[in-house]
């Protein structure tokens, strides 16, 4: 499809202006995968289309549930049309199961501890500083978001988590945690934005960590081989296929 000017490019996607509508943008998913704030980077042919397919499925489900997201359409597997947003530089994380960075930061908490309700955390998007955690008061004081926006991000992120958790639970998959982002559209409305794909969560079939289907498999590899990358591609394909069921019921 036709693209406008390039607005931004990250490790896994490129954002373009819409060629005719200034309220829209176009996201093109790349085949890149990275970990460690970009210290480890590889290319997996076809990953962009699989990530785009998963993201489109997730956002379609959320839109149907009445969540305000930036997603408009996915004309191609690796392409999304979205409402153009000024992104808020925060990762909003909800955790059901203690694992990953949480237990490294909180060694007194046993891995597998269940949080009910889900535990909410905010992180500043800053690779150079390794995405430092922020409190709501710090976010407000630094002018990153208003108090009302922080409250809205907290409530909407939990709603999104619970919807996705329920969808995964129907397939006997435990959603351990979920990272999402928000942006303001051209009218100032706060929307769930960016992408939600297999890089955004930890998912354990049957609640068994060793059966994980997500990006953590790539993070955990001591050495990345072509065979390892193919294993990761197959996992992303499985997740895309599984999320197809969320919108094709």
Swiss-Prot record:
Sorted UniProt keywords: ATP-binding, Ligase, Nucleotide-binding, Purine biosynthesis
UniProt lineage: Bacteria, Bacillati, Chloroflexota, Chloroflexia, Chloroflexales
UniProt GO MF annotations: ATP binding; phosphoribosylaminoimidazolesuccinocarboxamide synthase activity
Top EC category: ligase
Superkingdom of this protein's organism: Bacteria
Entry EC no(s): 6.3.2.6
Pfam families documented for this protein: SAICAR_synt
Protein name (Swiss-Prot/TrEMBL): Phosphoribosylaminoimidazole-succinocarboxamide synthase
Catalytic activity annotation: 5-amino-1-(5-phospho-D-ribosyl)imidazole-4-carboxylate + L-aspartate + ATP = (2S)-2-[5-amino-1-(5-phospho-beta-D-ribosyl)imidazole-4-carboxamido]succinate + ADP + phosphate + 2 H(+)
Functional pathway: Purine metabolism; IMP biosynthesis via de novo pathway; 5-amino-1-(5-phospho-D-ribosyl)imidazole-4-carboxamide from 5-amino-1-(5-phospho-D-ribosyl)imidazole-4-carboxylate: step 1/2
A GO biological-process term: 'de novo' IMP biosynthetic process
InterPro entries, sorted: SAICAR_synt/ADE2_N, SAICAR_synthetase, SAICAR_synthetase_CS
